[in-house]
């Protein structure tokens, strides 16, 4: 395998670059939660095995305009530094676990292709619609919105099949051993398989709940990314006893923090209607607070959480309006946006750039 020159970055959305002198460059743009970070790790690891150069970006909002901004900033850099990219036979933009770019606001390079790996029902743009603009530049389109798929499992399977095709079984099996178990463990949490598949074994349900605490108990998405990459470098796999022990620690520590946050949210709960409640909850605690609230208030059909710049929406499986529609309505009402899954979604209600100019009281007034 070729030797890589690798760099990690603290500023901006750029996280990681790897240069080995490959003939192809992969621009990986992913969401910043556990699923998005795992998706980026899957795409980056496949790039390494294929001996392709890569640059990884992670972004928190998952909004379409932010995907476009990241790509356009890279394109601006490329135009100013043509010698840094003209040697590539192909530059593949790999977008995972987030909205696609705004095609009317991006002018791709001649040798640029696009791949999209997502599972959010509220994000869907049909393949035929993208192909009308991109034509044969649309290289890979893997959108699966049922509970059996998340960004991690979609990128895992897509890269496994690509490695099988390009490098053969040996390379594909190495990739499988490194990332399959972890990716499917992420899926247990991210699409709420642990809660919504009754026949799931109890140990899988427990693991699913635990996985949801990982990105909440680590400093940042960049720290999570670097940690997973370091484990892969050291242990050659994420399916390792030390990793599962770390998950247990995250879960236990998170539970203690959530109990206090839940008590605070319950005291300040706003009853919107007989079936809808609004709770104040930081993103870090929102999932567990929603779970505990639903356990104690089974008649509620919708739980909305909010914090300084946005919030989340949960609806029960029998509720008539999908969560992503409610989230979109709230977000657009604040001149922002929202989306996600049928029963779990998120929204923005305060532009974080504007938030820099507001004091704490003003921020609370916005939400």
What is each PLM-predicted segment?
Residues 198, 210-253:
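Long, charge-rich alpha-helical interaction segments
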């Amino acid at each position: 395998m070729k030797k890589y020159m690798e760099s990690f970055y603290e500023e901006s959305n750029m996280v990681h670059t790897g240069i080995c002198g490959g003939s192809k460059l992969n621009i990986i743009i992913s969401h910043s939660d556990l699923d998005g970070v795992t998706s980026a790790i899957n795409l980056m690891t496949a790039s390494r095995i294929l001996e392709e150069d890569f640059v990884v970006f992670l972004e928190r909002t998952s909004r379409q305009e932010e995907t476009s901004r990241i790509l356009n900033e890279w394109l601006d850099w490329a135009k100013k530094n043509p010698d840094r990219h003209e040697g590539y036979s192909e530059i593949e933009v790999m977008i995972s676990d987030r909205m696609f770019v705004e095609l009317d606001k991006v002018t791709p390079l001649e040798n640029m292709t696009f791949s999209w790996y997502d599972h959010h029902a509220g994000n869907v743009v049909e393949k035929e619609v993208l192909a009308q603009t991109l034509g044969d530049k649309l290289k890979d389109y893997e959108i699966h919105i049922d509970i059996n798929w998340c960004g991690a499992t979609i990128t895992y399977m897509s890269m496994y099949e690509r490695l099988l095709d390009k490098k053969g079984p040996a390379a594909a099996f190495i990739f499988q051993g490194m990332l399959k178990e972890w990716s499917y463990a992420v899926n247990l949490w991210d699409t709420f398989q642990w809660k919504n598949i009754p026949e799931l074994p109890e140990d899988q349900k427990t693991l699913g709940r635990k996985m949801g605490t990982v990105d909440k108990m680590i400093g940042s998405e960049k720290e999570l990314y670097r940690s997973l990459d370091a484990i892969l470098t050291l242990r050659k796999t994420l399916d390792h006893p030390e990793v599962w022990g770390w998950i247990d620690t995250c879960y236990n520590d998170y539970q203690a923090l959530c109990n206090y946050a839940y008590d605070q949210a319950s005291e300040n709960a706003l009853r919107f209607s007989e079936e809808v409640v609004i709770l104040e909850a930081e993103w870090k605690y929102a999932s567990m607070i929603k779970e505990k609230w639903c356990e104690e208030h089974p008649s509620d059909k919708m739980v909305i959480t909010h914090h300084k710049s946005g919030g989340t929406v949960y609806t029960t499986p029998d509720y008539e309006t999908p969560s992503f529609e409610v989230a979109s309505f709230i977000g657009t009402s604040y001149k922002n946006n929202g989306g996600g899954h049928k029963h779990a979604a998120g929204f923005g209600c305060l532009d974080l750039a504007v938030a820099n100019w507001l004091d704490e009281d003003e921020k609370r007034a916005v939400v």
